[in-house]
Amino acid sequence: MIIAVYPGTFDPLTRGHEDLVRRAATLFDKVVVGIAHSRNKKPFFTIEERVDIAREVLGHYPNVEVHSFGGLLKDFVRDQNGRVIIRGLRAVSDFEYEFQMAGMNRHLLPDVETMFMTPSDQYQFISGTIVREIAQLGGDVSKFVFPSVERWLQAKAKERREQSAQGGA
């Protein structure tokens, strides 16, 4: 059984992410979507919310699982018996960072391959950061995320606006 691990923050999960998962699910026996705790970022959604969102969107794929992880990716990949790490490349600007990470992962996990996948053409420009910003400003994100994710974004953006109006975090 060949297991692929697709790690990321998925904050939020976009149509581009789902596109890669859908295509990877046809290539591998199992795809594990690993949602990172993101210690170096300030996520819009909590880790629990990101896992719930991903499970809502991806739950209909029989060979896809969603789990959260903290710590090193190498440990998560080992725990999942992963043989391949999937990384998405939207643009040439993504390549340098991803190439360095693939080299480090090869050093830490010599028997695990990194596979770069590009999103389908209609999703190449989508990023979670841009989607979050549009949602926070009240814009339409329906072309970039699934309806359930749009509802999560609207609710979280409203919650944040209310907190700001009250002087909260």
Swiss-Prot record:
- Positions with a binding annotation for ATP: T9, F10, H17, G88, L89, R90, E98, Y123, Q124, F125, I126, S127, G128, T129
| CDD domains on file | PPAT (cd02163)
Task: Name the predominant localization.
Answer: cytoplasm
Q: Where does substrate bind?
A: T9, K41, L73, R87
Kindly state which reaction or reactions the protein catalyses. Answer: (R)-4'-phosphopantetheine + ATP + H(+) = 3'-dephospho-CoA + diphosphate
List the Gene Ontology MF annotations in alphabetical order: ATP binding; pantetheine-phosphate adenylyltransferase activity
CC cofactor = Mg(2+)
Q: Where in the cell is it found?
A: Cytoplasm
Methyltransferase found in the keyword field: no
What cellular component GO annotations does this protein have?
A: cytoplasm
Q: How does it assemble?
A: Homohexamer.
Tell me, what does this protein do in biology? Reversibly transfers an adenylyl group from ATP to 4'-phosphopantetheine, yielding dephospho-CoA (dPCoA) and pyrophosphate.
Indicate what this protein is called per its UniProt record.
Answer: Phosphopantetheine adenylyltransferase
What organism is recorded for this protein? Bordetella pertussis (strain Tohama I / ATCC BAA-589 / NCTC 13251)
Traced from the root, the source organism's taxonomic lineage reads:
Bacteria, Pseudomonadati, Pseudomonadota, Betaproteobacteria, Burkholderiales
